[in-house]
Amino acid sequence: MSRKFKTYYVSSTNGDDCNNGEAPETAFGSLGRINNLELNPGDRVLLERGSVFENQYLHIKGRGTGSDRIEIGAYGEGTMPCIHSNGTGIWYQDYGAPLDSPSHVYKGEVSSALLLYDVEYILVHDLIITNSSPYTTMEEYAAPHKMDRTGIAVVAKNGGTLHDITIRNVWVHDVTGNVYNKHMNNGGIYMTALTPDNEEKTGIARYDGITIENCTVWRVSRWGIAVGYTYQHQKFSGVELDEETFRKYGHENVIIRNCYVSRAGGDAITPMYSLEPLTEHNIADSCAKEMNDSVYRYPEDRMGKVAAAIWPWKCKNARFCYNEVTDTRLNQDGMAYDADSGDGTLYEYNYSRSNEGGCIMFCMEEAVHNIFRKNISYDDLGGIISPACNPDALVTENEFHMRREVPLIRESMQDGTVTLKNNKITIIKEDEK
């Protein structure tokens, strides 16, 4: 006998927690009723459009299946429902081991407006999410041990490989997370993999099937969108990365498309530890806005006052196409694109403009087999190309529209190797800047 799927309705204006929540006329009144449920395959949670859930959060429990996924979305007419968590929804994150640098924080409390913890086969769509805190001084905002915050946090831990997680048409804004913590679930949309309680029993925690599309993320700290920092990071050391390593320890079928990230405190969009991730048709604007001395004041032993816009970390054959990056703020990096410590990164058909740290960096000794082709850079600053200790890179068939005083190779990052071939360089006139 097949189970009947359930739909739960929640309304901040017309609901009541004494209701059964199974029809719009008998909607729950708060998200707390959903947090107490274990969802089953095919179940839906729908929030009424026009609802505002103040000082509330949504932490989903349960799993869908390949044929019957869970859905979190909206119903009715009007504006998308809003979740303003305001520092609620606190959970404890622990990678279970130090990260790839001893300065990186790897455990602590996190506030997440929406948390998917060991959840798979799920679609989240049509929500507005914030997670802000009041502050009156920059000392408060930049406090070194301020709690990490997320708009949407996704965690893999005790479920082995998590499949088919889709986040679509969600607005995440005003997330006042920790200025310094790069690898906690800290920012707009952030996905991680933590050490399982019993890895032999449950399997390696990883993702296969992540889609983030048509999302808007703005005024968040620290990251805009990040997919996949993992407790298995040590498996990815070295130069040429093996595909089987990703299929066992990393992530597969990662897509980030049609998203807009603006005014992130640090980096805008980053797939991590992923095999052939696709990042396309995204826009990043005015990011890395907190990577400066006026905000980044109290890092203590943490380094990391660096950020770029759209880039991969420790990926194999990552592809970036039809993206646009403008006005990334100057820091040690500050460029639009960065092929960072990965194997076979391809940037093609992208556009960059007025990024204070330049257009493209090839970062460090483990950045190999990377190609930057058929892109357009217009009025990027600081130095267009940054070959930073990388063994090789091919830059070909691009258009670089430059100010006369801006160097093609960034002076502080010229220790690597880059091959320039068939690029078009045009000097911008004063009235064209």
Where are the regions that the model predicts?
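Extracellular/periplasmic catalytic domains that process cell-envelope and extracellular macromolecules
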Residues: 1-4, 39, 63-66, 107, ...
